């Protein structure tokens, strides 16, 4: 049995794929047209939209450009604080030091 048939589809992959499909259909584009714009087959677009294949960061960038949306469009409807999101919205961010902030020096 092929690996793609046995793996569980991650809910974030399914969500991103659904958002790709929503935007593509809102622009009245077929899968073949989007595929040509980003240099893949229409079958690959089908797999992305169904969440069967994960979309790499560079490919998601290409899709966002082709669909004229910012990258965060694909993640905008994920609920914050949902533990299934593997720490995408950690509650502890406020407790972390800001990048570049001076840290106290401890003397022994």
UniProtKB/Swiss-Prot annotation:
Start and end residues of each HTH cro/C1-type domain: 20-74
InterPro entries: Cro/C1-type_HTH, Lambda_DNA-bd_dom_sf
The keyword DNA-binding belongs to this UniProt entry's keyword annotation: yes
Gene Ontology MF annotations: DNA binding
Record's keyword annotation contains Transcription: yes
UniProt DNA-binding residue ranges: 31-50
Highest taxon, organism lineage: Bacteria
Alphabetically ordered keywords of this record: DNA-binding, Transcription, Transcription regulation
Protein name (record): Uncharacterized transcriptional regulator in ATPase CF(0) region
Organism of origin: Rhodospirillum rubrum
